[in-house]
């Protein structure tokens, strides 16, 4: 219902108002690889939960968890700033933003089609699988940071 969604939005905004400053400090403390590993591991569990739960309450809790860990993606930007040449940051971020906007149009349409044709579980299982791929890929982050770090004299 509209009331339920409104309450979920208010819960998310209140929680993230407190947690977002902690995310930056957490990146500094544990690093991008570990924080993104937590994000993608949690996303696997959340998407699998969405696909398998029959409870609206569980789905609501999963939504709040999903919203919290989605903000961990700031670690992608801090990682990029560590490995990119300064003159490449702005144009690369602009292209990434454009690609994200294009995906924001096509991915929901594809997900909706999969939902209608094959059941609501399929888009969430695909999301879990893609999160698994991302989890594997972020394991090379520390190596990339070391490769791009300035040499110490």
State where each predicted segment sits:
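A membrane-interface helix-boundary motif in multi-pass transporters
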Residues: 113-131
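Hydrophobic core of transmembrane alpha-helices in multi-pass small-molecule transporters
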Residues: 57-71
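Intracellular juxtamembrane helix-capping segments at the cytosolic ends
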Residues: 71-84
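Multi-pass alpha-helical transporter architecture, strongest
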Residues: 127-153
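Loop-to-transmembrane helix entry/capping segments in MFS-fold secondary transporters
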Residues: 2-3, 86-96
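Helix-to-loop junctions at the C-terminal end of transmembrane segments
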Residues: 19-31, 115-116
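Residue-level signature of mid-helix packing/kink "hotspots" within the transmembrane helices
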Residues: 13-21, 71, 101-105, 109
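Structural signature of the two symmetry-related core transmembrane helices
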Residues: 34-49, 125-128
